[in-house]
Amino acid sequence: MKYYILQFKFLTPVHFGTAENKKSGNLQSFNCCADTFFSALVTETAALDGELCSRFIEAVQKGGLLFSDFLPYYSGAEEELYVPVPYNCKEKVNPLDLQLSFKELCLQYEALRDHENMAYIRVSGIYDYLHPYESTAKEQEKHDFGWSGVQRRLDFRNGGRAYYVSNYTFAEGAGLYCIVGLDDEALLEGLVKAVELLGLGGIGGRRSSGFGKFVLKGAPQLLSEDCGGDAGMLKVLLENKTSSLQMSLSVLCPVQEQIATVKKGAFSLLKRSGFVYNQNSQNFEKRSSVYMLKAGSCFPERVEGRLLEFTALGVQHAVYRYGKAVYMGLPV
């Protein structure tokens, strides 16, 4: 399988609302899961080319087409690529050393708090993160990928009443990227066209307000060890199937036979729900909710996952939810 990187430069704020955001009180984040991207991609491709859409679905079912979640990148002096912090490391935080001075204790507490709140880590910093006592590397510069905000809107269908929409705006040089695993290179051209079409209408929520519009930042990048930097290291980790710790880079829905392997790992559950458009009633119908394993979940071996297929009341076509994972072998 060959791996490509698609980098997205967002032209407008994004709205990726999840039940997790509401529960935690987080107004908005830039977390766009692979199932959201796949659903949007299939919808756009079906309007563009029904046969191509069927080929995408068939390739995913056979494991020949894989997507990661949208992950952050930052373009500065170097092209920095970030991945989720492994869940098995979040519980292995050293306690505070009460023998230290008050000033040193405060610094240690701040470092501990930053460690607990960290969601993403640069690819080139993974080894140092996993082996903090062996590393002599300097601390990497931290970037703000953007900021959360709230915008006021007027609903003229209901007398011009005001309502508020949370969103996330990316900083200059920051954006999101997606790792695409592909067996059949013949699908790449159609995939790029579908993604470009998707960018015109936007991805995520509140697209009618202009949110989620993006363009591709250059052509798809084929990952190889010759790429150098974060991209070259990412390629090595994606191909590392022998590591005793395999981290998923996308939401995952395992099959029954894989539950035993999942139980040996470290993971967090994420509720996924949504709506599907019913052309007969001209309304959106709520589709079944499902709990999936978040990106960053770690297992002793790679758990393939599956593509879920649902039916919705009044909807004549099948409804899919992506639940397969892209993995990287961690350097433990």
Which positions does each model-derived feature cover?
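Conserved active-site/ligand-binding neighborhood in enzyme cores
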Residues: 1-332
